[in-house]
Amino acid sequence: MAPHEKGVNPSESPSGSLKKAPPSGPKALRGFASPSAFRNAGIGNGLLQHRGEDERISFAFPRKGKESLDRNGERPAPMSLESRLGPPVSRFNRPVGGDSLERGNGKGGWDNRDERTSASSSSIHRINKEKIRPRSDFIESSANLYSEDDRNRDRGRYHERDRSRGTNGDRGGGEGHSHREPGRGKEHQNGQGRDRSLYRDHSRERESSRDERDRYSEEYKHQRSKARFSPSPSPERSRLKSSLGRHRSPVSVSSSSSSSARSPPPVQNREPLRYNGSQSKNGEKELSNGLLENSISRSGVSIAVPRKLETKQLVRPSPPHVNLKSTIQDNPSPPTGKYPPSPPSLDILSKPSCNREPLPDQRPPTPPLPENSSPTSPSLESSRFDQNQHLLPDELPLPPLSISFPQKPVSSSSLSRLSSLSAALSRPNPLDKDGTSMPPSFHFREISNRHQRLSPPNNAENQLPETSIIPPPPSETVPEPPWIRPPYIPPPCTKHRPGIGNFFITNLREKVEDKSGKEEKRVDGMEGGKVVQVTDPRLSMTEEQRGRGRGSSKQRAAFYELTYEWDLYSVTPKPPSPPTAVLITGLGPLTTVDQITKFLRPHGRIKEIDSKVDRKTDMQLGICWVKFEGPPLGRPGTAHDVASMAVKVCDGKKISMGGERIRVVLDGRGKRAEQAVKEEMERRYPPKKPSALPSDMKVTPLSGTAMATTSRPPNAPNASTPLIDKQTFDTSAKAPIIRPGVLKPLGQKMYHRPSAPPLVFNNHRFRDESFLNRPFNAGAGMISQQQMGYKILPGKPVQQLASSFTSAPFVRHPRERREDSWTNERGRRLKGESSTRHWRARSLSRSSYSSYSSYSSYSEESEEERPRHPTKVPYPQRKRLATGPSKEDEYKMEDVREAIRENGHPCVFIDAKSLPAAREYESRQSHLGWYILFADDTTAYRVQRVLDTTAVQGHRLSLVVHTSSGPRAQTDASEPVTGGVGESKKGNWRYLTITKKSRPMPAVKKSGKSATIRRKVYSPSVSGSDDDDEQVPVMAQNRKRAPSYASSTSPLSEDDRPFARSVQREERDIDKEGKFSLIGKKADVVSVKAAKGPKSKTIRVDSDEVEENQGVPLASIGEVTKAEGKQDDSTVVKLETLLSESISELTKGKKRPTKAKGGKATKKVRLDQEADDAATKIQIDEDIVPQPPKKKKVVKTEVDKLLASGVLMDEEDAYWLGRVLAAQEDGLEPIWSDGEEDLVDEGHPLFHKSGAWRAEGWKKVAQVQKSRYLPQRNRAVVNSEDVGGITTGRTARLAGRDQHRQTAAVAANNTVESDLFAFNQLRIRKKQLRFARSAIEGYGLYAMETIHAGEMVCEYVGDLVRATVADVREQRYLKQGIGSSYLFRIDNDIVCDATFKGSVSRLINHSCDPSANAKIIKVNGQSKIVIYAERTLYPGEEILYDYKFPLESDPALRVPCLCGAATCRGWLN
C-alpha cells in the first residue's frame, strides 16, 4: 500500500532506512508500512527487505511470543551481513576460514556444507530477485508465517532431506512446504506426508502474495514520482541524511515470495552473500536465525555488526520489540517546540537482551549542556504518528528517507568523521525557545575491521547521495587569483647561423631596371657585419602632412555632405529609379521596329519601344527609345542590368543593311530622346533668319494726332508720356517679323506703362500661327509699323484650319485680361501666344501636344528642357475653384446662355472637371466647362456617342448633350425681335410634344447677304490711381474676315465690367451661314442671322447706357438708326433683360450650369431696314465725345412681376409659360401629357394589341424598323421614287461626272509603288481609330484624327482559308447565331475570315455613299486587304465603304441596306 494512503509523508517514508520489525502476528507486512500497520500486524519470524538500485539487504527477527533459542538455551547471536563478495572463497566454492552459509542440524545454528548455500525456511526467508523489481526506493515486505507448532513438527522432517539437491535451488521458506527443485517436476519425498490442507492454504497465500506484489509495483511508480519532489522535513534532518548517505548504506525491509517456481535463474559470476553466526566452543558455528542473500541480487551490501571487545565475536542485538512493554511506560511526552525534534538514536539495534551482558557504551561523549538547562530524553516527532502513537515505544523512530549506502562497506577509519558529525548534531539548537539542546540523534557503532580492505576511505568520501537528498551548502572559499602569463625569458645564449634570418632586398629598384644587377640582401638588419641604423619614414614628412594624417586617420580639410539611402521617412523627394531604358541613335531611315525588336530581344524582355518619326512626313528620324521590362525568363537580374548590358554590347553595332553603326546610351526618363528629336528636327527644318533692319531706321516720336488719340486726356499727370519707350528698340538688333495688319508686336503694351520687350516668334516653340495669320485693321491715328521698327512682309491669305467633327470653324478671342508679371502692375495683354509647336498649327478642339507616334507616351520631364518665355509658363496650375462664382463668371455664363439660345440646336457640354490643367491659350470657357455648338440637331449626339470618355492627356472627357430650350435662330430678318412674351407672332414658337415619335428637325439653310453691325461703346476708364481717372475713347475699326470663320465676341466685354481700367471695343459680325463651333472663356459665340432683304442696309448701334462703378453689370442698350430713303426721323426701341440666371443657384457651388431653355432675347433693339438693295455701308463717326454714365431706372415687365410673386421660379418656367401663351394666341389648346401613355399607330413597330409589353412575348425587330423610332439611327427607308429621281436627274449626272473625274485623277496617281509606300507608312505610324456604336447597325469604326484622301486607313486582317472552307464556316456561323458576316473574298480561292481572328477593321459598315474603299495589294508575294480613304475623313466621322456584294435575284435572299445615304440602293446584294 502506498505511503500516502496511510497518512505517511512521502518525503519521510522509510525507503532506504532501517525499519523496526513489526510485532508478531499472523499477517505478513508488505510494501510501505505505517506505524499503525506495525501495531496491528503481529508476525513471527518476519522478513523485511530493502531493494536498492545496486544492493539489497535482508535480515530476520525472531518471534516475540515463543522465542527460538539455541542449543544452549540462549537467544541467537546478533546477525551480521557481509558484502556481496563475502569471505574469501576457495576454488570449490567454500569460504576460507570455515564460514559457510549452510544450514546445520535444524537447531538454529550454522555449520559448513560443501555445495549448499541455502538456509532453513523456519528461521529465514530466502530472497529472490523478481522480474518486476523496481528501483532502490521501492520497499516490498513479505514473509511466510507459520505457527510454532507447525515449525516444530516439520523441523525434523525438513533436515532429513536428501543433501544431494542442487545448491542453487530456490525453494520457499517454511516447514511443511512442498519443495520443488529447479528442472524437476516431482515432489520432495520428505514432504509427501504433510497435511494437504496446509499445502492448499500456503498455495493460496503464495498466489495472493504474487497479486499484491503486482499491485505494489504499480504503487511504487506513483510513489516514486511524488517522492522525487517532496521537500525535506527540516534543515537538520537534511544534513543528517546527507551525512548518513555518505557513510552508510541504506537499510530497507523487504521480503520476497517463497515460491521457488517463480524464482528466476541465478546470476552467473556473482558470489552469494553469506551469514556468519556465532560459533560454539568446539569451533563449530552455532545455529541461529539468520539472513541469506541469494545469488541473483543486484549487488551485495554489508551492514556493520558490533563485536565483543574481549572475545572479538559478533554480537547480535535484540530485536526492538523485546522490551516493548517497558518502553511504552517510559515514553516521554512529545516536545512543544517550534521546530520538530531530532530523530531518536539508532543504538536500539545494539541494545542487548535481558539474558546477555550489556555491551560497553561505544557512543561518543555527550557534550556538556549549557547553563540553566536540564537533560531531556529524546522524543519522537509527533507529526509522524497517527492517533495510536502511544502504542509504540520511544526507541522505534522512523529513519530518514532515501539514505543510500555506498556499494562498498564503510571502513572503521571513517568513524571519526561520524563521531564529529554526531557531536555537531548534539549541540544545542539556538533556535529553541527554552534553550535546551537535544541529545545526538544517532549513536554509531564501530564497523568491523574485516571490511577495511573492501572500502577505502577515499571511496567512502566520494559517494554522492541520491537525487532526493538536498546537499549541504558549500563552504565559502576565497577565489583564486587569475592566472598571469609569466614574462618570456630568452635562453641564455643563441648563436647566429649565417644565411638564416630575416632579410631585406636593398637594390630592388635597380634589379627591376637592370635585370643583370645582383641582388643584395640585408639580413637581420646588418650589412657587412654592421647594424644598419633604421630611421622612421614619418620623420621625413612635413609638419603639414603629419597634421593632416594618413590613411584612416587622415583629417578632412572641409565638411563632406553625407548621403543616405532614401526610404519612406526621408524628407527629400524620392530619387529616380535606375534607368531601365536605352536610346538608340544613328538608325537608317528604312529600319523598322521589328528589326530593332529582334536585335534587342536576346538581351531581355522589351516593355515599350518608341520609334521617333518626322511629324511632317511620318518618316523615320533614326531615333528609337526602348524600355526593358526585365531579363529573359529564367535568368536572374533586373531591368537596369539588362539596359546596362545592352549599352555595353550593342553600342557601335549594325542593325540594318545600310551599314550604319548605332549609338546606344542609357535614357531612363526619356530626356535624351526628347533632346535628340529636337536637334534632329531643327537640323531638318532650320528656322528662317529674320532680316536685319536698315541702319538708317530710327524710332521717331509719335505725332500729335497719334498722341492725342492713344494717350489719356490732358488732365492726367502723365499724359505726355509716349506710348513706346525709346529704350525698347535697338537699331542694331534684328527686327522681328510682323504680319500685315498687325497693330503692334505681340507682348507690346498699348498703354502708358514700361513696355516689355517684343516677343520674337521665329525661335519660340510656344506660339500660335493661327493667331499671327489673323489680320488686324490698322485704324487712323495708330502707330505705323515703320515707326515701330518692324519689317513689313507681303500679305497672304489667311490659313484655313481643318474643321472639327461638323466642319464648323473655330474662333478665338484676340485678347484677354491677365496680370503683368514683369512690371507687377495690372493690365491687359494680347492672348495670341500659344504653346503649340512651331512646325504645326494645332486644332483648338484637341490637345495642345500631339503624340510623337502611336507607340510613345508624352513625358512631363521633357518639358524641363523646352525653351519658354520668362513670363510664359507652359504648365500653369489649375485655378482653385472658389466657393461661388465671381461676377466675371456670371457675365461669362450669361454670354454663353445667350449664344445657346440664339443657336437653338443641341450642344455638347464638356465638364471642366474632366479637362486637364487649363493653359493660357485654352482659357476661353466658362468656369463650369466648355460648350460646343453645332449647326444641326444630330451632330451633338454623334459627337457625344463617339468622343465620350475619350482620354486627352491622361484625362477622360465627360460629354453631356444639352438641348436648347430657346427658339431656333431666326431666318427672316424682316421680323422684328420682340421683347415681351405676348408679342410673339404666330410661327415664332413651335409647340413641341415630347414623344418617342418626335425627331429633331433638320436645320434649314438660309441665304442672304451678310451684314456687319458696328457698335460704338463709350465706357469710362475706372482706376484707383490718380493718373487713371480719365476716359479714353477707342474707335472700333472695320475688318473683313474669311468666309470660313465665324468671328464674334461676347456682347458684354471684359472692360465693360466693374473696376475695368480701359476701354475695349466690340464688334459683332453677322455671317450668312450662321455656324459656330466653340464657346470659350471670354470669347462667346453669338449667332446673329442676317435677314433676307432686297436692299442694302446701314445699321448703326449706339450705346447710350454705360455701367456705373458700383459693381452692377452693365446693361448695354444700343440704338439702331434706320435711314429709309431720305427720312431723318428714327425710332429707338429699347431692349431690356427679361430673365437671368438666379445668382443664388450659382453660389451654391453647382458643378454644371442649369440647362438654358429660355427663348427670349436679352436686349431690346429697334431695327430699321433700308429699302435700298445695295451693298452694306459702314458709317464711322469721327467726332466721338465721351459722355458721363447715366442712371436709368429699369422698368419692370410682366415677367419680373411673375418672378417676384413666386409664380415663376426660374428661366425654364418662364419659357414654358411663353410657349403656352403663344399657343393660346394661335387658338390651340394645350395638351397636358402628364399621366398619359404614349400611344403609337398600329403600323408602328412598337405597337402591341394586348396593351401590355409582357403579354406580347419576345419578337425580333428588324433593323429597318428600328431606324424608324430610334433617334440615333439613320433614315434607312428610302423611297424608290426619290431614288429613281436622283439617279436619273440632272443633279445625279453632274455628281457622277464629278466623281468620275476625281476617281480618274486618283487612279492616275495611285500606282503600285504609291500603295506600297502608303502601306509602309501605316506600319510606321498607325492611324488613330476607335470603334463605337454606329448609327447604321451595331458597331462602327470612327476616325480619331484627320485622314486625307488617298491615305491608308487600316488593314483588313483575318484567317486566310479556302473558298470551300469559307462556305462551311458561313453555314456554321448562321447556326451559331452570328448574324454578321466577316468573310472578305480576296480572289476565287482565298477568303479572309475575320470572325474570330481579326482587328477593328472588320467593324467597318457598308454604305452606298462610302468614304473609303478597299484594295488588294501584294507585299512580298502575299495578298493584303488595305482600306484607303476616298475623301478627307475628319475626327469623329465614321469610316464606310461599299461591300460590293453580288446582286441576288431572289428577293428572299436580299439584305436591306441601312446606310441612309441619299444614293442608297436599298439593298446590300
Swiss-Prot record:
Assigned GO CC terms:
chromosome; Set1C/COMPASS complex
Sections of the chain in a coiled coil: none
Keyword field contains S-adenosyl-L-methionine: yes
- Regions of compositional bias (Pro residues) in chain numbering: 332-344, 361-370
Where along the chain is composition biased (Polar residues)? 291-300, 455-464, 963-973
**A single GO molecular function, which one?**
RNA binding
Q: Known PROSITE patterns for this protein?
A: POST_SET (PS50868), SET (PS50280)
Compartmental location = Nucleus; Chromosome
Provide the E.C. number(s) assigned to this enzyme.
Answer: 2.1.1.354
Q: Which Pfam families does the entry mention?
A: SET (PF00856)
Q: How does it assemble?
A: Component of the Set1C/COMPASS complex.
Q: What is this protein called?
A: Histone-lysine N-methyltransferase, H3 lysine-4 specific
